[in-house]
Amino acid sequence: MDLHYDCAESPAAEQPSGKINKTAFKLFGKRRSGSAMPTIFGVKNKGDGKGTGNIGMVRSKTLDGLADVVLESNKKEEPCTNAGAGQLNTEKSPKVVTINPDVSSDSSVAKSHSFFSLLKRNGKSENVKGELAEQKPGSRQKRGLKGLFNSMRWSKKDKSYKDDKEGASENQPGLILPSSLTASLECIKEETQKPLCEKEKSEEDIPADVPSVEHSGDVNTSAEENPLNGCVESPCPALITKEPQLEDPPVIQQVDNLYQLPDPEVETLPDNKDEDVTGDIPVNTVSIVEPECDVGQEIAAPDPTTVDPPSEPSFDRICLMLADVTSLKSFDSLTGCGDVIADQDDDGGSSKGSKVVPGNGKKVTSKKNANIVAYQGGGEEMASPEEADETYVQELFSMIPQSEGASEKPEKVNGTTQVTAREVKCSDSGRDRNTVKPSKLRQVPIRRKERGDQNSKGNEKRQCHRNSDEGYWDSTTLGQEEEEPRSVGKQALPRDSCSGDALYDLYTDPDESIPKAQAEEPPVSHSHSKPLSPVTASCPVKTASSNKESKIPISIKHLPVHTTNQGIDSGSGSAAGHSHPVKSELPRTKIPVSKVLVRRVSNKAITETAAGKRAIHDPARKHH
């Protein structure tokens, strides 16, 4: 506590600002005795040309590991002249310790005494290590920032321990390697530099370990020691020739028991060792055989004396090389384009083929072809459109045996009458005028002529867009309503393999006429004209198909065509009469009927969402 009070009282007594800063920086200089940092602080604090002399002082006195001389010289330069500082520079470390109390007494400053006492304690602790410290600080001063970290006391202790350990390791290098088979490469390099000394020591002190150490030295420096082996091995050829012959058979037995290497390589081990002692065979032949022994030894952990540790760096490199190569091979095998994709496609192709047609023998052959194509990169062809075509064609023939003729005749009629939209609509309008009341229905065909003359295709696309907003299958048949009946028998079948929508287009052609009429008839606003609108849409087309009474739902909407041709009253009765057998036919048509009904419900307005049956019965109710 006295020291702290002295430190507090002293600045009030003597020039507080300058001296406090100097002492503070000098403490840092003491803690970092061998570095350039205290000199930099000193230059900043002392500024008036005194920094040059002080730098020299720091360098001269830190050789002893004491920064007290610098502090004392700085304290004396303030009350005294520079000559006193020069005298202190010439003084040596044993005198410095005796001068410290004199300096504190001459300055008569409690602050300086407190700091000096702290510095003296550190200095005395360093004087205990004076001899060890004198050797190193000269080199530490020149290292720059490294000296800052090395100047600390704990770092010095660590280095002293490290130096002791290094000395012990240099004195006994042969003891470090047997400790572990995976010794660091530095120890191995040290042994490669000093193999001859190890031979002499091992031969004199440890005769049992002679062959292993000798072989390691020969393997490492077979090219370097061949001229030297004649000089060094001359005093001890007896030990070399006698002991390996006695100890090689147990080594071979250990290799046979532990490593289980192939016989020819094991038999070459004693020959290689006996010839490595003579230095006749190069190192490469030994390195080819011994890495496998090293692997076995690392696994089984036998006596380290039988191992050639210098071969570990090269063996480790080879292992890393092999590991990289094997990793690349495994990566290619796991993610190789050809094999894995072929396997996946095989699985996918077999599953697809089995799902499409499980029983046909032709599909089995097509699976093989598909696999070959997939392996070559045709993964997209695994869908096998040919198989799909066959299946859909079979379904068509099974589902529609009677509708083939019906579908062919509409094609012919379409080829003659519906070459263009104008001819179709003109013929429709002509029959409608002759058969139906002219007062109300003439307006509809006239508007159809105008639209057919001007915007036939544009209106169809717009109506299909409206249907696409409401319906589901209309989007697939945009702008092809007139051409689809042509492509029913020829073009629809190849499309079925890809999408399967053309089959539904077969049955949904009449449905598309309904939304057309509904979109075109809002100005008429008469309720009974709406069910008659499909008659005006495609009368000549469906008369031929309805005479056959095919199972296609075309007959649902175009049976009223006969009613209009025969008369309004008879048409209502016939519509009511034909609607019932149509109901019985609906379950017979498999998929398209359900799709058509769904589309009719979705395409009609909210007021007409009841069903297609009500739309068919509406003319009968309203004419009666």
From Swiss-Prot:
Protein's recorded name: APC membrane recruitment protein 2
Primary subcellular site in the record, as a coarse category: membrane
Taxonomic classification: Eukaryota, Metazoa, Chordata, Craniata, Vertebrata
Pfam families assigned to the protein according to its UniProt record, in alphabetical order: AMER
One cellular component term from this protein's GO annotations in UniProt: plasma membrane
Topology in membrane: Peripheral membrane protein
Localization terms from the record: Cell membrane
Family stated for the protein in its record: Belongs to the Amer family.
GO terms of biological process kind: ectoderm development; negative regulation of canonical Wnt signaling pathway; regulation of canonical Wnt signaling pathway; Wnt signaling pathway
The keyword Cell membrane is annotated on this UniProt entry: yes
